[in-house]
Amino acid sequence: MLASLIGGIFGTKNERELKRMRKIVEQINALEPTISALSDADLSAKTPEFKQRYNNGESLDKLLPEAFAVCREAAKRVMGMRHYDVQLIGGITLHEGKIAEMRTGEGKTLMGTLACYLNALSGEGVHVITVNDYLAQRDAELNRPLFEFLGLSIGTIYSMQEPAEKAAAYLADITYGTNNEFGFDYLRDNMVFSLAEKKQRGLHYAIIDEVDSILIDEARTPLIISGQSEDSSHLYTAINTIPPKLRPQKEEKVADGGHFWIDEKQRSVEMTEIGYETVEQELIQMGLLAEGESLYSATNLNLVHHVSAAIRAHFLFQRDVHYIIHDGEVVIVDEHTGRTMPGRRWSEGLHQAVEAKEGLAIQPENQTLATTTFQNYFRLYKKLSGMTGTADTEAAEMKEIYGLDVVIIPTHRPMIRNDQNDLIYLNRNGKYNAIIQEIMNIRQQGVAPILIGTATIEASEILSSKLKQAGIHHEVLNAKQHEREADIIAQAGSPNAVTIATNMAGRGTDIILGGNWKAKLAKLENPTPEDEARLKAQWEQDHEDVLQAGGLHIIGSERHESRRIDNQLRGRAGRQGDPGVSRFYLSLEDDLMRIFAGDRVVAMMRAMGLKEDEAIEHKMVSRSIENAQRKVEARNFDIRKNLLKYDDVNNEQRKIIYSQRDEILAENTLQEYVEEMHREVMQAMIANFIPPESIHDQWDVEGLENALRIDLGIELPVQEWLEQDRRLDEEGLVERISDEVIARYRQRRAQMGDESAAMLERHFVLNSLDRHWKDHLAAMDYLRQGIHLRGYAQKNPEQEYKKEAFNLFVNMLGVIKTDVVTDLSRVHIPTPEELAEMEAQQQQQAEAMKLSFEHDDVDGLTGEVTASQEALNDSATEQQTFPVPESRNAPCPCGSGLKYKQCHGKI
C-alpha cells in the first residue's frame, strides 16, 4: 500500500531509470544527422578514434552517445536495420551492468550490438553468452558484417574446438559461446601446465542472453570436470535387480510395509527399516554382504551408495522425461529447455544406475577434478549484464546474488495478446482430449497457427499421437528433433501450422506470423529474383490471413514450476504488437498440482463430481496454482542460496589454488618458492619430535634423525650438535636443520643445472598441487553431504562447514609442501633425455586426459551418500586397522607395496 502510494507520487524505480536513460537517447538522436552524413570510410574510422580517446583517459560513459550513434548508423547501412529508441535504452541498460527485460520479438540481438561495440573499445574483450551452440553461431554470423564494418574482430567458441581456433576466438574483440563452454574453459585453463595453453585472457565484460535461464535455472547445477575412476560396473548390474523387488511407502510417517519413502520435491529416497532388512538379505544372497554384517557399517557404505542410486534410477528418473536413449547411450534431457545434453552425465553413480536399468553398457564412474558454479563463475567478471523476456519475477534474486538490477524496457508497439483463464480438468486424458478439441475448433474458424507447449517429451508424444488419430498434420519439437529445430520454429507461424514444443524456454528464434519466407528461399538450390518475389508475395498474403485469424494461438498443456517459464511460452505470441491468444490446460494429475497445490483443492474438485471432459475456472484454484508456483520458486531460491553459501567457501579456496597455480606457471624459477617450502616442512617435521616450548627430556632426537633419513634421504648428526652446543634451543635447531637441508638441495640443484632444476621443480609442484586439490574436492564434497547432521548437535552447519573446510584446506597445503620436498630430496638427478621424456609425457597427459563435463545433482545438499564419501569412509576405517609407520614414505603396513602416504595414509 505504502509502496504503491510512494510510486504514484514519485514514480517507480523503473520509471525513474527510463526517464534518465531517455535523456541519453535524446543525445544519441541529436547526433544522427551528423553521423549519417559520414562516408563509409569515415564511419569505420570512428572505431580507432574512439579507442584512442579511451586510451587517453576518456570513459566509456562519455563515449556512449557518439558510439551508439555510430553503431546504429552502421547497422542501418550494413544490416538494413535501425535501432529503435527502446533498443537504445536496452543498450544503455546492458552497458551499465544491469538486466534488460525486453519482450519476445522486440530485437534483443540487435540491442546487444550497442553494448558489445562500446565495451569492445576498451580492448579487453566482450563475451556474449547464449544457451546453446546454435544461437551462439547464429548471432555471431548475423552480427559479423556489422562488427567487421566497424573494424572489430569476432570469434565463436564451442565444444571439441581445436585449441588454436579457440585461443584465437578468445583473442577477438567480441566472443560468442555458451555458458557451459565459457565455464568449462575457465576450469580447463586452471588445469594446464603452461601459460601458453590458457585460452581465456581475462573476464572483463559479459552479456548473457536468456539471463534468467542461465543465472537462475542452471545456477542450481554446479559445473564439474571429472575423470574416470575405478570400474564398478559389476556392482551396478548386480544391484539393479533389487529395486524391482521393492515398493515405495505411500506416506513418509505411516509405515505400510513399504521399503522406502520418495521425496519428489528433493528427488531423494530414504529406506525404511523393512527396506534395510530386505536389501541386506538380497545383498547377502548375492555374496556382496557377509552374513550378520550391517549394510550401514563403515566398510559397506559403497553398497549404500549403489542401492540408493539404483532406487532413484528406477523410481525417480523416467525415460523420455528425464533422459532419452540415443545410439545405445543415456542422454540427459534438460528439464528447463527440453534439450538433450550429449556428453553430460549425472554424478553420484546415478548415470551408471540408469544405464544398468536400461540394460546398456555401463560407463565408469567419474572423479571430480575441478568444479565451480555458474553463480561464482559469472561473479568473476568485472562487469556483468543480461537480457531476457522474463526476469522481473526473479528480480530480488538477481539483486541479492549477482548485484544486478532489472530494468523493464517498454515495447516498441503496445501488447494486444489475449491471455485467457486456465481450464482445469479431472485427469490428464480429459485435458489432452480438450486440447485436441480446441485445436479442431481453431482450425474450423480460420488459418491461425497453433503452438502447443508441453513440459515433457512424453506429453509431447501423447499429444502427437492424438493429433495423428484426429488427422491433424503437425510438427513436434523436442530433444529428439534437435537437428530440425530451426526449420520447425521458422515455419511455426505459417497458416494452419500446428507445432508441439517441449519447454519453449531458450529456443531463441522468433515465430513470424505467416512463416519465414527467407528460410524457404535459403532452401532453394539456385534461387532467382523471381523466386524471391514469389515467396515474399506469398508471405505477405499469409501474414495478412494469420493476422485476420487472430495471430498465433498458444496452448499450454501444463503449468511449469516457474511462472517465468510459463510467461516465456506465452511470450511467443503477440510479438511487436501482433495479435495472439494464450491459454493453459491443467489437470489434477499434473506434477505441480499433485505435489504442491494441496489436498484441499483436489478434494474440492472431486466433491463437485466433475466428469473427465468437464473443466472449471475458479479463482481459488488459480490462486492455489500461483501459490504453488511461488512456493516452488521460493524453495528453488533457497536451494540456490544454500548452494552458494557452501560454494562461497569452496570458491575462496579455489581462487587461492588457481592464483597460486598461475604464479607457478608465470615464474621462470621456483627456487625461492621451493626453499620456503623446505623451511615450513622442516618446522612441521621437527615439531612432531620436538614439541614447541618443551623440555629436553621430551625431545625425540633419534626419531627426528630417522625421519630426516627416511623422508629426505639426509643423515644429520642432530644429537651430536646438541651435545656440542648445550645452548642450542628448539628455534635454533629448526634454523640449523633447515639451513643444512636447503644447502644440500642447492648442491643437487647445481648438479642438475638451472634449466633442468626449474623444470623438475615445476613438474613436482604442479603434480602435487593438482593431485591433492582433486582429493580435497572429494573430501569437501563428503563434508558437505553430512554437515547437516551437525544441526542435531545444536551446532550451526554452515559455521561448522567453514571451520572444517578451513582445516581440510590447511592440511592439504601442508601435505602438498611435504610431498614436494620429499620428492625433490629423494629423486635421482635426471639426464637431459629423461627430462625431455618427462615433459613429453606431461604434455601427452594434458592432451589425452579423458575429461567429462557434468552438471552435478543439487540433491547432494540433502546428505545422500556419494562415491567420495564411500572412499573416505573406507580410508578412515582402514587407518584404524593398521599401525602408523614412522614416515609417510615408508611402505604401508597393509602389505599393498605402496607408500603409506599413497595408501592408508592418503589424505
From Swiss-Prot:
Its main location: membrane. It is found in: Cell inner membrane; Cytoplasm. ATP binds at residues 87, 105-109, 510. It is a peripheral membrane protein. GO terms for cellular component: cell envelope Sec protein transport complex; cytosol; plasma membrane. It is an enzyme of class 7 (translocase). May bind 1 zinc ion per subunit. Its EC number is 7.4.2.8. GO terms for molecular function: ATP binding; metal ion binding; protein-exporting ATPase activity. Zn(2+) binds at residues 892, 894, 903-904. Its cofactor is Zn(2+). One of its GO terms (biological process) is protein import. Keywords: ATP-binding, Cell inner membrane, Cell membrane, Cytoplasm, Membrane, Metal-binding, Nucleotide-binding, Protein transport, Translocase, Translocation, Transport, Zinc. InterPro entries: Helicase_ATP-bd (IPR014001), Helicase_C-like (IPR001650), P-loop_NTPase (IPR027417), SEC_C_motif (IPR004027), SecA (IPR000185), SecA_CS (IPR020937), SecA_DEAD (IPR011115), SecA_motor_DEAD (IPR014018). Pfam families: P-loop_SecA, SEC-C, SecA_DEAD, SecA_PP_bind, SecA_SW. It catalyses: ATP + H2O + cellular proteinSide 1 = ADP + phosphate + cellular proteinSide 2. Monomer and homodimer. Part of the essential Sec protein translocation apparatus which comprises SecA, SecYEG and auxiliary proteins SecDF-YajC and YidC. Part of the Sec protein translocase complex. Interacts with the SecYEG preprotein conducting channel. Has a central role in coupling the hydrolysis of ATP to the transfer of proteins into and across the cell membrane, serving both as a receptor for the preprotein-SecB complex and as an ATP-driven molecular motor driving the stepwise translocation of polypeptide chains across the membrane. Belongs to the SecA family. This is Protein translocase subunit SecA.
